[in-house]
Amino acid sequence: MLIGWIESNLTNMFTDVNEKVGTIAAEVGQTPSGWNGGVYQMIRGLSENVIVPIAGIIITFVLCYELISMITEKNNLHDMDTWMFFKWFFKAAVAIYLVTHTFDIVMAVFDIGQNVVSGAAGVIHGNASIDIDATIAQMRTGMENMGVGELLGLSIETLLISLCLKIMAILITVILYGRMIEIYCTVSIAPIPIATMSNREWGSIGTNYLKGLFALAFQGFLIMVCVGIYAVLINGMIIADNIHSALFSVAAHTVILCFSLFKTGSLAKSIFHAH
């Protein structure tokens, strides 16, 4: 009876590990428009109705500043040519185009990120899922040689480890949802930094914003890498001869996974040099 209970706990635990890989891949691979249509429409409405008018004011200021700078830097108005005005009109057209197509640009960035995550999910899910039946069969041989006391201790261990995995799953869900909320907040204010990109001095605001956007998009890939490493390590530890050691390794790797997921955001920003 104890062996049957332990096998049931192990089956549930390994099933959770396999499902977690697929669940995280599905969550991380979502774009802002696909994750929650209602939230996306609200954010888009706020951006277009509240932020875009402010971005228009910023464009006006930036373009006026740009025109004054272009004129005054030419020897106090004595050395001027008509070409600078064509250049200014081109900058103005580009700036207006970028602001009016901000959401297309932002969604394109996350479409790239989604494509990368989807490709990674296929590789990770195919190579890192645990063969539950084979693993349980291998463990059954070791459990049949254990006494009642050791089996009772092992059953408690499996119960605790299974509970630990469920808690970690909740924390991972919090991380994933927190990332999506951060994405929505970042997207909502997109027109303002984009409006500064036509100016040499102010353009760093928009450039840094795009870096942060790419960091958020590719954070999903880093999350998939962490999950893939976790699943492969778990798969290797499960087949260990010492069942107790294998179970505690599962717990240790789960804690490491959760810590690694918390670090993916700062790592992605560091890679893209986003402040």
PLM regions with names:
Residues 1-58:
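Binding/recognition "hotspot" determinant
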Residues 1-6, 80-98, 102, 206-215:
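Alpha-helical transmembrane segments and their helix-start/interface "positive-inside/aromatic belt" motifs
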Residues 43-52, 83, 87-90, 144, ...:
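Alpha-helical membrane-interface segments at transmembrane helix boundaries
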Residues 56, 60-72, 223-238:
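Juxtamembrane "helix exit" motif at the C-terminal ends of alpha-helical transmembrane segments
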Residues 58-94, 189-203:
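Hydrophobic transmembrane alpha-helix segments characteristic of membrane transport
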Residues 93-189, 223, 227-272:
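Non-cytosolic segments of integral membrane proteins
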Residues 194-211, 239-240, 270-273:
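Alpha-helical transmembrane segments
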Residues 212-224:
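Alpha-helical transmembrane segments of multi-pass membrane proteins
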